[in-house]
């Protein structure tokens, strides 16, 4: 997902070169144009009215694609892997050398051993490793960890009476959680985020990719020597026997969810809770309203607005359109969801949205993503119940790229709240002292350890690698004050500020 953050798409250099044979006379809608950034839903609506469920568009660099804006057509594409491949080796224009060298998309949507870019048995093997490894995280333990992470972040601004919640909360919660779940030491995570930042903001995409991959390889080497109860160790020990390159690619994909899509989900739901009267009232902090707000966002304004490309492996007809083998087809999750609501308004009462995809390539971490978002929102509204938007909702600025949707900043005001004086231990619930760093058992058939009867598998979350550092002998407790805290957060805040502004 991170690879799809095309921060160069709004620059003049993203336009196709004059006379490019791949784009002459296509009449395609340029999704890199300012109009799309200002109001993407107006563009989706116009495309649907003019072309039906599939419409010709151009990505950055003039890359041609068909954009799917119809719900039923999108479902059919995602559920027909025998016809629609995710492997860029099937991309005809790429294979024929027709794509601009300046384009961001072909450089990142390249053949690579990542679960979102492969099909068939290779896809099943990689996805099985991801699902088995992420499935070992106990939801109760994860909930407790997110609550404590949220408390620590809220402590940093709760006494000020005002805050900007995207950079200081909505984006930091998932980043800290991902570092925790990876079992990633601070120094490695700092370098990893610097690499991802260079990739995302377009300053050095290839160099940033290398830096991030090198940091992950160092993490993998560390976990081979010192396995622990974390996703990295579980992926390494999985019976699928992933290569180091495959391990790097799967971790990059998971990291993309935390640094990219999750801030948009949390931020957009919080915007609704603060500005939409349907979500106001005395029970504002209640879990039902939070869940309703998340459903609203996932249906009407999903954080991943458009997803990566599909390629028909043979000529085919779908949605009233003839596609040639190797055509690039991009599914607009935002447009297809709204198409479904136009046809059947009652759908919004269920979770049949496509915000997490569908079919064999549906997001494997959707349940954890939703849990992190809901807990982060509940905790914030519980700690600061009188949050109010500082300014008019019409003044909020939005990301203007093709793939990711969300507000750039979310300024709020509130009555100052005194932060609790007690420290919070980071030992996960249900884990006895000394058990936290036990490695996974490599001999289990499906890569999982047996859990006691009545308990969830592996109810452990690794120690907080990216927490605010604690002094020696503190027992892993938070230290929310002092110079170390400022140093700890500087890299994360710098990274997040950098990529948000680049959008």
Predicted ranges, named:
Residues 2-166, 175-193, 197-199, 478, ...:
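Active-site substrate-recognition loop segments, prototypically the cytochrome P450 B′-helix/B-C loop
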Residues 180-184, 271-282, 338-341, 415-419:
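Cytochrome P450
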Residues 284-319:
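Conserved cytochrome P450 K-helix E-x-x-R motif and the immediately C-terminal K′/meander segment
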Residues 306, 319-320, 325-339:
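A translation/RNA-centric and nucleic-acid-associated enzymatic feature enriched
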Residues 295, 334-371:
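Cytochrome P450 heme-binding Cys-pocket and its upstream "meander" loop
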Residues 182, 191-241, 245:
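Cytochrome P450 catalytic core segment centered on helix I
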Residues 248-255, 259-284, 364-384:
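Cytochrome P450 catalytic-core helices
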